[in-house]
């Protein structure tokens, strides 16, 4: 460490000052009972096990003293505290007894801890002085020491000569002048330390066998003063430092103060004896602002005693953890290896001090041998043509890493870390020259010796030496705008700088301090705020600084600092480290806080990239900001022994040494010369980083514009050679073996609109074939990314690609035979044309050349599927695709076919409909009618999604059949990168149209570039591991073949077997919830009802609730009621095999009552539903249910919480057509209300689900086949009519009125009056969607044999929908059914929302229940009648609007439909 024992006393004398030793803590009881224990000890057993330490003889040496050896505990020190502010007038309170009480409080807790090890320890003794009026503290301490010695000698319970004693000497340097950086230069009086040493000398002479804790409570006293805001006794004047005391200065001075005490005591005679020692025990708080005043427990007796015990358990020199309750540490225990109290000797403290210092650091220079160091022939006007020698001015913004804190400090000189060595700063320092000091400024001076702006020497940002290094130690992102303002003003006002003409390079690096403190305020230090603050600074530079190249260096990967902190073999002042960066170092491995830090760190980096990639700073030709990411993945440098290498750090182990500054400068310089997208993000700093030279072809500092050259890509592949022998197998095909590329498809492959300008909608008809992702060959990979341009990097003789523009018949198209608007049925003609062209063209050796043909089809089919669902069925789609592939398979040799998924129609809808101001929404029906004109949550949209799934499924089945794997020279590989598109979303939530042509449908060149990269990546990925997601905004580097895997991947060389679709064994669900416990006490309010609180389930309804036909009948008898499988009340089996509401609830409460089992009425439980029931039967069922509950001996009617589900209406609708004049809606609502009134009056503690009736006509439309015949025979007369009949239309209106009639029950006044009763309408059937199979037809597996009732699969889906509705707030419930199979669809209660939702706890309409007038019976028919009128008017308006849409004029772009 480098501190010399000879100067310890001198340092301590200078640091201590005049403060009177005293303690100020919060008043507490003087015994252990009633104490506020730290959170880690509350309600928990004593954590230490004394028995594990074994039974040993009492220690003969204080340096092997175990807690069990201690026989006596005592304390001295003047413990004065302010009284509790809540007890009245502070100045009138009697303070006479308080010092004794406080001391006894602390010592009692400490004695109780020790008593676990040494049960015979008597009550502690405190001698804290008896005077009320404060007087000289040193004199009082002498008196206390003498009284203590006399007391111990007279104590009959104590063997004074042979018993081990623990004596605590409390003192406080209340002036805290030692925290001023200038304290070492001020000759402060040293009386305080002299008297303390005198007291210790007295104790050493008089007291045998003693372990003395010298406890410094300076900060406790200060915090107590701040917390209570007043002192009764005169307090010493606070020390006003002559200069600003920064956080860094404070923690360094704290450490220095502590080390001075340690060094003094460790080298004193106290550590040389066997029966007496003194150990310094510091009490420093975390430096988090306002933490002290937030928690008075930081000054209570228990916390102080607990912290003192932990200090005794820590080796000297390793007492690094600050005092904290908010992030408390557990009580520490003696270990078997170190069962004793730590002294300086048994901590090997002096040995560590005297360890030979590392050799003095030699500053790293460099040599630059670049052939071209000349500036541009004329001063450039574009930042994208800027050579290093053109730079005239250099500046920097940031924090202490740029200010250079400690960069030139000698090893061990921790105090010198306060010095800012700006001349050594990596990004802007200019000390000496490049031969001795490597910095960016010194590198640039090799190109332009007249460079200005660099800093030299030492000093703060305001010193002349700093010049344009305006970084501020301790700076955070929020401070950057002020720094930027000052930098701009300095450049404008300095006569050496030609502000308008000089080219400037400014490096901005920030974020370390933000991450170090992020956990104290996640909102304040959020990634968004971080980048917003950077943006504000950059905005100033962008607005005011001409001719500037700004390096934005991303925040370093700070979590690796933990390696240095945790490695005890490497010396570091850990107290400083932890105080400077608590949020990185104080949390445990695998903690959620650490995971949050890593996430924030990554998001800081990602958000920085996004800020710049937005183009916000590329609006001028003379200004740009470039992200330099070399710090993003920096591993902790290691020594040859594998330990963290602290030679890369300043003596505080936090800031950079000159070696790190040198490596950072080299890495920054190299980053500046690397193209964007190809910049190095990972460095091993232990390896010296060579300085590269500008590329003679591209001699400029790299910007986004001059790197990408439009939409180019860098290919890092080194091995670009073809196979040694021309391959005969498609499974041994390398990229360089490909000689021909071709493509088939629709307008996406034809290239419509790829190069169109954003506002040029008519230009979308232009086919930019040369830019097409799979077949275009315009330019080169350096500026145009396409699959052919990638392949041309491997084989310059590649042919077949298209160039320029034109249709499929143009010469430029060559083998890109895609046709705009083409459908699957058109593929055959494209295949025929393609084969003929390949046979006729002399550039193609038809039989010998290896070919890659990419096929993408299906988008245009989906655009028209709704015009004829049979013509565009999945069966017809795959039939046409199969025929085309069969011809290629049969007639074209040496082919690898890429079969690419089509663009998901959902993405097209999101972009097109999400940007009505940018997209031609008026032309939706012309551009892609069956995709763009559908309503959200409509049956038509569900059918579109089913068709899309069916198309994809049929493609997979076709390829997976092995049909095209029968020849050695032919294979079809499905490339699935299009399966999941991650659509970029702008800050306003709208989809990003910058990836699309002006019609918002076709991809533009930006999109095509990503498609080409994704296709190439897929081609190199083995089957079974192919990427199925395309993130359009992600940086997608080009992957390369490897030596072990050099081939384009096929099923065979991937060792892949296509999976067989497994049969589904049951319709159970997986239970993934973690919040499953009941309330701590039985709730009295239905609005605080958790699922586990439910004791009883019940149900009312018809045959859908008795589960008629849920399973096939084994006889010709009438259908069976499978009550045990019923969605809302069945309890057969368990959730893993049968998904029902009771089986879900049984996961929360295994003792649930009331559910049905099996098929017999005797096991129906509280399922009172009956086949054929209508709404008029609900009151009778309600009475039946009430009687069953009252008569059940297992149910406590008054105390048990009950969940009742009512679902009725199907039979009412089925028979409506027999008497259409009846007031069905009015009567329906009245009957259900009567049933609910009965339940409300008779059942305490009840939660009632009222499920809206499904849309009957929608659910049963289009069943066809056997079901069509059964529908004509069943008792539901209304379903016998055709979909277009007036009767069926009238049924739909009545159906809507029934739903509307009961939809407001949740809000009715009479059901919100009781605290223990609620009615909640569950609307998942409001918009009923017919379940569809993979072919887009009605999925009959959801229905029973009679095609009317639900099968067990249908019951499972209803149970899931009901359960999920129950966990959704009123007003935000799902109003449509999603009948698709997944075992993981069940929602879970959360810690934030653990209750079943009612109107009140949904908080949507908090006052509605109180304000709504009571619903009168006479008002029901009126409401129903109004609802009917509204329904009729709404239907007419909707039809008119739809008719209006059909009359939109056609558009000429119809020919470019997908």
From Swiss-Prot:
Active site: residue positions: 400, 514, 655
Glycan attachment positions: 173, 240, 493, 529, 590, 690, 783, 797, 809, 1055, 1113, 1275, 1378
Sequence repeats: from-to residues: 39-347, 362-707, 708-1054, 1064-1402
Record carries keyword Signal: yes
InterPro entries: GDSL, Lipase_GDSL_AS, Phospholipase_B, PLB1, SGNH_hydro_sf
Subcellular location: Apical cell membrane
Keywords: Cell membrane, Glycoprotein, Hydrolase, Lipid metabolism, Membrane, Phospholipid metabolism, Repeat, Signal, Transmembrane, Transmembrane helix
Signal peptide boundaries: 1-21
Gene Ontology cellular component list: apical plasma membrane; brush border membrane; plasma membrane
Catalytic reaction annotation: a 1,2-diacyl-sn-glycero-3-phosphocholine + H2O = a 1-acyl-sn-glycero-3-phosphocholine + a fatty acid + H(+); a 1-O-alkyl-2-acyl-sn-glycero-3-phosphocholine + H2O = a 1-O-alkyl-sn-glycero-3-phosphocholine + a fatty acid + H(+); a 1-acyl-sn-glycero-3-phosphocholine + H2O = sn-glycerol 3-phosphocholine + a fatty acid + H(+); a triacylglycerol + H2O = a diacylglycerol + a fatty acid + H(+)
Tissue/organ expression: Expressed in the epidermis (at protein level).
Stretches for region 4 X 308-326 AA approximate repeats: 39-1402
Membrane-spanning intervals of the chain: 1418-1438
Record PTM text: Undergoes proteolytic cleavage in the ileum.
Residue intervals on the Extracellular side: 22-1417
UniProt topology in membrane: Single-pass type I membrane protein
Enzyme Commission number, as recorded: 3.1.1.5, 3.1.1.4, 3.1.1.3
CDD domains, alphabetized: Phospholipase_B_like
PROSITE patterns: LIPASE_GDSL_SER
A GO molecular function held by the record: calcium-independent phospholipase A2 activity
EC top class named in words: hydrolase
Family to which the UniProt record says this protein belongs: Belongs to the 'GDSL' lipolytic enzyme family. Phospholipase B1 subfamily.
Domain notes per entry: Repeat 2 contains the catalytic domain.
Function: Calcium-independent membrane-associated phospholipase that catalyzes complete diacylation of phospholipids by hydrolyzing both sn-1 and sn-2 fatty acyl chains attached to the glycerol backbone (phospholipase B activity). Has dual phospholipase and lysophospholipase activities toward diacylphospholipids. Preferentially cleaves sn-2 ester bonds over sn-1 bonds. Acts as a lipase toward glycerolipid substrates. Hydrolyzes fatty acyl chains of diacylglycerols with preference for the sn-2 position and of triacylglycerols with not positional selectivity.
Protein name: Phospholipase B1, membrane-associated
UniProt source species: Homo sapiens
